[in-house]
């Protein structure tokens, strides 16, 4: 995750802003600079290489002292920064909006995946600039539309029916901020269209998840799509979701947290997010993740979760 101010800076033209991507040498200069505390939140002028991000975002970049940041000296950083600028320059951003836009925290990996989709000549985003920009505006929170299959970050499709597409995420192969844990495995499920879904399609998805992915929990971060994650990573997701929700509430950037379909979501996660929306503390909410919750009556007659051991999926072992 990183703020948009880590990728580009605004230049005032007439009554709106044009966004310009940073170059790696300007960032490198900023990372070595001694800057007064009162100037930490201001864009840094490297004198030689142009404008650089505010020094307060130093930890967002990979250095010898911080291996958790972005690999800003890669060509992928340039591609992501340019793509963000293209999207922001396609709309009008006024002075009253600028601070909110630049402080917005976005998913670096999501944006790298959109670059990969853009460069794939078999992908619809390769052929449609309009759809590409729409996908980026959704990814950076500048559009209120949800991420559907056409505008999704992408990955490897492992399941699809008339209503849903399930993607295996490819973060292990990334250049900008790769997942370093080689045991990482995670999926995302997007809606093919943002419209009511038939029970038949939901039943098909639930059957697939229970049969092939019974070692995973189906959760949501509240943005209109599902995530399929290892049970061992659920607590970490809970911390991130709670922190983001509280931060958005505090800053006034309140967006409706979409709980999604209770028949699909893991019941403990549904309880956690419902409790969070009611304003409870993190400790109170997280206890619900580890409690035995009484199983709701099976909404799909004939669809059982009971399996013999030799029938259980080996995905995720």
Swiss-Prot record:
The active site is at residue 225. Its main location: host cell. One of its GO terms (biological process) is viral genome replication. Its EC number is 3.6.4.-. Keywords: ATP-binding, Host cytoplasm, Hydrolase, Magnesium, Metal-binding, Nucleotide-binding, RNA-binding. The keyword Aminoacyl-tRNA synthetase does not apply. It is an enzyme of class 3 (hydrolase). Belongs to the rotavirus NSP2 family. Homooctamer. Interacts with VP1; this interaction is weak. Interacts with NSP5; this interaction leads to up-regulation of NSP5 phosphorylation and formation of viral factories. Interacts with host DCP1A, DCP1B, DDX6, EDC4 and EIF2S1/eIF2-alpha; these interactions are probably part of the sequestration of some host SGs and PBs proteins in viral factories. This is Non-structural protein 2. It comes from Rotavirus A (strain RVA/Human/United States/D/1974/G1P1A[8]) (RV-A). The lineage of its organism: Viruses, Riboviria, Orthornavirae, Duplornaviricota, Resentoviricetes.
